Swiss-Prot record:
This is Putative multidrug resistance protein MdtD. GO terms for cellular component: plasma membrane. The lineage of its organism: Bacteria, Pseudomonadati, Pseudomonadota, Gammaproteobacteria, Enterobacterales. GO terms for molecular function: transmembrane transporter activity. InterPro entries: EmrB-like (IPR004638), MFS (IPR011701), MFS_dom (IPR020846), MFS_trans_sf (IPR036259), Multi-R_MdtD (IPR023721). The gene is mdtD. It is a multi-pass membrane protein. PANTHER family: BLR6921 PROTEIN, MAJOR FACILITATOR SUPERFAMILY MULTIDRUG TRANSPORTER MFSC. Keywords: Cell inner membrane, Cell membrane, Membrane, Transmembrane, Transmembrane helix, Transport. Belongs to the major facilitator superfamily. TCR/Tet family. CDD domains: MFS_LmrB_MDR_like. Residues 1-11, 70-76, 125-137, 186-196, 246-262, 307-341, 417-430 are periplasmic. It holds the Pfam family MFS_1. It is found in: Cell inner membrane. Residues 33-48, 98-101, 159-164, 218-224, 284-285, 363-395, 452-471 are cytoplasmic.
Amino acid sequence: MTDLPDSTRWQLWIVAFGFFMQSLDTTIVNTALPSMAQSLGESPLHMHMVIVSYVLTVAVMLPASGWLADKVGVRNIFFTAIVLFTLGSLFCALSGTLNELLLARALQGVGGAMMVPVGRLTVMKIVPREQYMAAMTFVTLPGQVGPLLGPALGGLLVEYASWHWIFLINIPVGIIGAIATLMLMPNYTMQTRRFDLSGFLLLAVGMAVLTLALDGSKGTGLSPLTIDGLVAVGVVALVLYLLHARNNNRALFSLKLFRTRTFSLGLAGSFAGRIGSGMLPFMTPVFLQIGLGFSPFHAGLMMIPMVLGSMGMKRIVVQVVNRFGYRRVLVATTLGLSLVTLLFMTTALLGWYYVLPFVLFLQGMVNSTRFSSMNTLTLKDLPDNLASSGNSLLSMIMQLSMSIGVTIAGLLLGLFGSQHVSIDSGTTQTVFMYTWLSMALIIALPAFIFARVPNDTHQNVAISRRKRSAQ
């Protein structure tokens, strides 16, 4: 990329900057949840909603981000994304109640939903096609560093300052990014088709109310009748979307996608698989602090081996899948992740703390292999004219399943524990033990889906898409 103009390189730095902000925020909050609960006078069992409100908002807003960028311009939308993310961070730091914090996190989520996909779109428009892969590697590298720094930085700020600083550090960074975006980034626009607003609203309502209903009376205090009403509204909204999308060429996500068997299996497996794995980044630091008495900084440091294992495994995933095939790899990694989850719980409760970094490193390796395999399986056989829509739907499902996973983890803690789990409680470790056992079972269940995947070992990761028209 050395032959790119200076202006283009600066624009790539701005996109990389946004990727770093968004990825850092996905992990920096987890370590601070117990301290937030104490400061806000809430039970730790309710704090999972701090994560859910952000991730669910990202899932809801993702389908609109690309259309908005084409319609209004990538610079305008990227600038708006940074401003909303920064304002959300400020309001998070100023929050005095859990409800205020949840609203501020939702505002952050609107910005986060637009930042990454619009950043990818910007790279496509400013660099030559032959340099696109190198440019994407450059801008996504900070996004890989964010999860590595997030847990430890969050723990450090909580332990030596306060939880408010995990949000306040975004403000000067966001101001610099917003100014640089206005000054340096071109405002590319494209002719767009009419946005499927009806489909967008139906999906948004369905996802939001079903997730809220899943949280149930344990997390929200809603009555059983209200929860039943939410479930009914959510199901009706999703059914109406299916009717809306049938034979509709302008639907947000075409139902023709599901005629490709590997896409259907991969999407179902990704949804179920990420529900289980989405629990782990939330539960691990909470368990280390509340269940075992680790300090926030120590708990954050313990998360680093998991990220390192994930980053290291990415280099050889292609060779592994090509050697053994999708079915064997996905079934093995799904069951393996369940076993590693049990191993982590066992070694932690036995007090073998020196073993935990190695277990978490192994967990990161297994999870990374499974994620990469699920992603490529889902998209590899889609025809060209459906590839973009399929990728957008996969991105939305990834975020939605993570929010559901965190919600279920909070629900399990509430089911097995009292309203106020604390380090001093004699039943705390028992509560966490039952929760981890339930999580291990949930993590293993998608193996039944992956067992149905054709085990073609010759065309696994080479996504040289054949030119086909959608049927």
